[in-house]
Curated annotation (Swiss-Prot):
Functional summary from the UniProt entry: Negative regulator of replication initiation, which contributes to regulation of DNA replication and ensures that replication initiation occurs exactly once per chromosome per cell cycle. Binds to pairs of hemimethylated GATC sequences in the oriC region, thus preventing assembly of replication proteins and re-initiation at newly replicated origins. Repression is relieved when the region becomes fully methylated.
Protein name: Negative modulator of initiation of replication
Residue ranges, annotated region (Interaction with DNA): 86-87
Gene name tied to this protein: seqA
Entry annotated with the keyword DNA-binding: yes
Family recorded in the similarity comment: Belongs to the SeqA family.
Keywords on record: Cytoplasm, DNA replication inhibitor, DNA-binding
Record's keyword annotation contains Chloroplast: no
Domain of life: Bacteria
Length: 179
């Protein structure tokens, strides 16, 4: 792997073209330049095979399916507009998601970058993963999120959260535009 130095404007442009969490700069540039992206870099890790256990099949199906929650109606537009900056709006929306279904929120802990931790249950966990994480608590949820990402990355992270909640694409776009 070779390293190159790029100016801030170019870095922001590349970062804004991120399509999924964990996508490397090389993958972004390869995609933008129309070059072949290495298969190993884009493929998800294989999940372990689920072994059927009599009497538990129905429970497993229920847990795997995200429960649809209409988050659009649970976000107070006036309070969102009053939130300070992109970080404030990001935290406000995450708190609204949490309040809509607190028992389902733990799944955000699965959202991670290639070398980055985005959510944790303590400030220390995020700081241990990255000294520059600038962790903030999501309301009074007991969950913490890294906030030193650019706005495009915050939107990508929020998109992943909303996907986990079974939110439809049109709502995801509408909600993430508010950051």
């Amino acid at each position: 792997m070779k390293y190159i130095e790029v100016d801030e404007e170019l870095y922001r442009l590349i970062a804004s073209k991120t399509e999924r969490i964990g996508e490397s700069a090389s993958e972004i540039l390869r995609r933008l330049l129309g070059l072949e992206v290495e298969a190993s870099a884009t493929q998800e890790k294989d999940e372990p095979e689920v072994i059927s256990q009599p009497g538990l099949e129905e429970t497993a199906d229920v847990e795997d399916k995200p429960r649809f929650i209409d988050l659009h109606s649970s976000i107070n537009k006036e309070e969102l507009a009053a939130a300070k900056g992109a970080v404030g709006r990001f935290l406000f929306i995450l708190e609204a998601v949490y309040l809509a279904s607190p028992e389902q929120f733990a799944q955000v802990l699965k959202i991670k970058g290639r070398d980055r931790l985005y959510f944790a249950t303590s400030k220390q966990s995020l700081l241990k993963a990255s000294k520059s994480a600038n962790p903030k608590e999501i309301g009074q949820s007991g969950y913490w999120v890294t906030t030193n990402n650019n706005t495009a990355k915050k939107r990508t992270i929020l998109t992943e959260v909303l996907h986990q909640y079974g939110t439809v694409e049109a709502q995801i776009e509408s909600i993430t535009r508010n950051i």
